[in-house]
């Protein structure tokens, strides 16, 4: 999928693979919809909901666990923004690795080891830290 839509050439997607374009196309250019964007980062980089909010009048909630990028999310978006780590189990303490768009929750099933992540971030001169967070 390319990053513009045949019916509306003014649409430019900021999502990684055109997820927002798929939503608009599937819902026939629906206006005033509602979204829940989990892992919203700064609200613009690779955003699946920014275009829906700005061009189509959608409202919703952006959730971002990384406390380092959350202030940017809050300033970049009009919708409700929540700094929280969501999980299927409430009130568990989980280790969250803060690494911009590569952030993730510690678990035994991840494909990339922590050492590989740290090396990648070092090569790209990107910050990294690990924090404990309570799930919601």
PLM segments and residue spans:
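Phosphate/nucleotide-binding beta-alpha loop and adjacent structural elements of enzyme active sites
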Residues: 1-136
